[in-house]
């Protein structure tokens, strides 16, 4: 595998993509290892949330 490779169902959403109602890929290969992807709610301005595919517990996040 190489950086940027994804695993998951066909047409799955990649890291950083908005995932409200969509399906994130299950894994992304980043920094020499497979990492889990989930649809996570991030604060987006005041009292708003956006849901993006990201690695759980990713501080940059």
Swiss-Prot record:
It is found in: Secreted. Disulfide bonds join 12-25, 19-39, 24-53. GO terms for cellular component: extracellular region; host cell presynaptic membrane. Keywords: Disulfide bond, Ion channel impairing toxin, Knottin, Neurotoxin, Presynaptic neurotoxin, Secreted, Toxin, Voltage-gated sodium channel impairing toxin. It comes from the Eukaryota. InterPro entries: Beta/Mu-DGTX-Dc1. One of its GO terms (molecular function) is toxin activity. Pfam families: m_DGTX_Dc1a_b_c. Expressed by the venom gland. Its main location: secreted. The presence of a 'disulfide through disulfide knot' structurally defines this protein as a knottin. Acts by delaying the inactivation of presynaptic voltage-sensitive sodium channels (Nav). Acts against insects and causes a progressive spastic paralysis. Belongs to the neurotoxin 26 (DTX) family. This is Mu-diguetoxin-Dc1c. It comes from Diguetia canities (Desert bush spider).
